[in-house]
Amino acid sequence: MQVIATAGHVDHGKSTLVKALTTMEPDRWEEEKRRGLTIDLGFAWTTLPSGENVAFVDVPGHERFLGNMLAGLGPIGLGPAPVLLFVVAADEGWQAQSSDHLDAAVALGIERAVVVLSRADKADAQQRANAAAQVQRELAGTPLAQVPVVEVSAVTGEGVDKLREALDGLVGPEPDPVAAVRLWIDRSFSITGAGTVVTGTLVAGTLRPGDTLSLFQATGVREVEVRGLHSENAAIDLAQPVSRVAVNLRGIDAGTIHRGDVLTTPGKWEAARVIDVRRTTGRNLDVIPQEVVAHLGSAGVGVHVRPFDAQHARLQLPEPLPVVVGDRLILRGPGARHVLAGVEVIDVAPPELNRRGEG
C-alpha cells in the first residue's frame, strides 16, 4: 500500500478529488459537510490499475487549520518514500496556501508527487495554460520541479484515469518491515464492544495482535497491548508498512490518548528533550522567534530555540519525544499560519551548553 497526502489551497477541490478517486467521502464531520470546508484530517482508500492499494490522508487547505494539515503530512514525511497529491485549481491558479503547503512539503524533503490542475471543467484553455505555467514557476528549484502534472475534473471525470496511472507510476524504495515501529497517532476514539482505537500511518515495522508497545505521551511512557488491528475497514492479523492502520488497545481509556502521542517498539527508541538541528529551508534560525511550534510526525509542540548561528540551533522540547538523527521538523510561530523554517535533527543527545545566558 501507498499512503498519499493531499496538499493545496482551500477550496481547490482536494476532498472532491479524493472522492472521485475512491468513491468515499473523506470529510468526517457534519460541520465539514455543511460548510463544504475540510477542517480536520480525512481518510479514504482505493485500488490503482496495477492492483496496488492506496490510502489518502486528506488535509485542510484553510490557513486557520495549518496545524491540522501538518499533523496529516508529518507522519507520511517520515516514511521511506512520501507521496503528495498537490492540487491547484485550473480556474484560479496558484494561491497563498499553495505556497504554504509547498513550503511544508519541501521542509519534509518530499520528492514524489503528482500535481493536479483541478476544476478543469471551469477553466478555458488559456486559464489552464496559465495555471500550468504558474505551477512550473513555483516548483522550479524545489525537489518537486519535475513531477507530473495532470488536468482533472472531478465533476466530468476528465483526467481521472490519467491521474490513477500517474499515481501508479510513483514507485519508491521498499519500506523496512523489520524496523522498529514508530506510529504517530492522529485519532483516538472508543468503539462499543471493542474499546480504545487509535489510528495512524505505519511507515516502518510490523504490528500484530498481542504485541506490547510503548506509548509516548506528555505525561510519560507506558506499556500497552495490541488487542486487534484493522486496515481499510477490515480486521487484519498483520499490519505492514506503508499503510493506514487502526490499532485496538487493551486496558487504556481513549480519552487519555491524544494526537501527537506515539506508539513504539519497546526499548528501541530513546526519548529526547533537547535536540540540535540544522536548517534545511525557510528563514535563518538566528532571526526566528525564540518560542515556536515544532511539528514532528503528528505532534505539534511548543519549543524554545537557542540559535548557534543562521544554520544551526538547539531546541528544548516540553516533553520527551522519540526523535532520531535525520528526522525533519517544521517550525512555525505560535498562532502563525505560515511555515517559518524546516530543520533536520543532527543530534538527539547533545552536550550541555555552559555559556553565559544559556536557558
Regions found by a protein language model. Name each.
Residues 1-59:
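Conserved G1/Walker A P-loop phosphate-binding module
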Residues 3-6, 122-128, 134-137, 149, ...:
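C-terminal effector modules of nucleic-acid-centric enzymes and ribosome-associated factors
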Residues 4-8, 12-20, 64-72, 77, ...:
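P-loop/Walker A NTP-binding module and the surrounding RecA-like catalytic core of P-loop NTPases
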Residues 10, 37-39, 45-50, 71-80, ...:
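Conserved catalytic network of the ASCE P-loop NTPase/AAA+ motor domain
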Residues 52-53, 59-64, 76-102, 106-129:
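Conserved Switch II/interswitch segment of TRAFAC-class P-loop GTPases
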Residues 62-63, 90-94, 110, 119-124, ...:
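Conserved nucleotide-binding/hydrolysis micro-motifs of P-loop NTPases
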Residues 120, 137-283:
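Conserved catalytic-core segments of large NTP-driven translation/proteostasis enzymes
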